[in-house]
């Protein structure tokens, strides 16, 4: 049976409740398009996150990896197209959960500049929209631990020649976090809505080994 590994992060920075954790946990054990979902919460720290994901890949032996993270300020699910070989959380005024601040450092000095997601990004976005969930394609995964982990997992898969497809979905803040005084006006999305979008997206990823070449209208500005 096909297995899908879903990863999420716990609290970090000024985010006390991470939608990636709650969404990953809600998906754990589900069967989607005949595939079993196995979720793992990984550390929100540079390099530790990659090591934990590599261990989960070895244990679960998935055919598909979908990684989740929060992107404050975005109003919809965003499926990332690229992961860069650069880390810079100093620009955000943030440290990772181990207290580490990286500024302009690569994830792997010998690795390529970037990796493309190997999931059908357009098909996933179209499936999410068809399910009534706002979603878009993104070409900017940031330079914090989300981008770092996406790059690290894709690099691991490529260098180990593993038969695994992998990609990243960013989630808006949770309503309970957007309701905090410091976050008023920040877009949010409930766990239930995010889960519905991920179910549709994972189904598309399981069913489509190649992406559509049809253009996907985009409104993403950040």
Curated annotation (Swiss-Prot):
Which catalytic residues are annotated?
A: 80, 146, 170
* Entry EC number(s): 3.4.19.3
Q: Which key words tag this protein in UniProt?
A: Cytoplasm, Hydrolase, Protease, Thiol protease
Cell membrane among keywords: no
Molecular-function GO term, any one = pyroglutamyl-peptidase activity
> What does it catalyze?
Release of an N-terminal pyroglutamyl group from a polypeptide, the second amino acid generally not being Pro
Tell whether RNA-binding is among the UniProt keywords.
no
**Group of enzyme by EC:** hydrolase
Q: Which GO terms describe its cellular component?
A: cytosol
Instruction: Please give the CDD domains that the UniProt record associates with this protein.
Output: Peptidase_C15 (cd00501)
- Which cellular compartments is it found in? Cytoplasm
Q: Which GO terms describe its biological process?
A: proteolysis
As for what it does, the entry says:
Removes 5-oxoproline from various penultimate amino acid residues except L-proline.
Instruction: Report the sequence similarity comment from the record.
Output: Belongs to the peptidase C15 family.
How does this polypeptide assemble, per the annotation? Homotetramer.
Report the protein name in the record: Pyrrolidone-carboxylate peptidase
Q: Which organism is it from?
A: Mycobacterium marinum (strain ATCC BAA-535 / M)
Starting at the broadest rank, the lineage of the source organism is: Bacteria, Bacillati, Actinomycetota, Actinomycetes, Mycobacteriales
Gene name, per UniProt, is pcp
């Amino acid at each position: 049976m096909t297995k899908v590994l879903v990863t999420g992060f716990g609290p970090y920075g000024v985010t006390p409740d991470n939608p990636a954790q709650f969404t990953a946990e809600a998906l754990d054990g589900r069967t989607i398009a005949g595939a079993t979902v196995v979720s793992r919460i990984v550390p929100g720290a540079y390099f530790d996150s990659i090591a934990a994901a590599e261990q989960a890949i070895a244990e679960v032996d998935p055919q598909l990896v979908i990684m989740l993270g929060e992107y404050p300020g975005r109003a919809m699910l965003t499926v990332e197209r690229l992961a860069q070989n650069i880390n810079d959380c100093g620009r955000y005024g943030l440290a990772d959960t181990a207290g580490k601040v990286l500024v302009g450092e690569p994830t792997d000095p010998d690795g390529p500049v970037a990796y493309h997601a190997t999931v059908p990004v357009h098909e996933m976005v179209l499936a999410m929209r068809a399910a009534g969930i706002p979603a878009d394609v993104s070409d900017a995964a940031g330079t914090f631990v989300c981008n770092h982990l996406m790059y690290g997992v894709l690099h691991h898969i490529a260098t180990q020649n593993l038969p695994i497809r992998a990609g990243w979905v960013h989630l808006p803040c949770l309503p309970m976090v957007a309701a905090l005084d410091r976050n008023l006006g920040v877009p949010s999305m409930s766990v239930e809505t995010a889960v519905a979008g991920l179910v549709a997206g994972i189904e598309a990823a399981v069913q489509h080994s190649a992406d559509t070449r049809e253009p996907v209208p985009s409104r993403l500005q950040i």
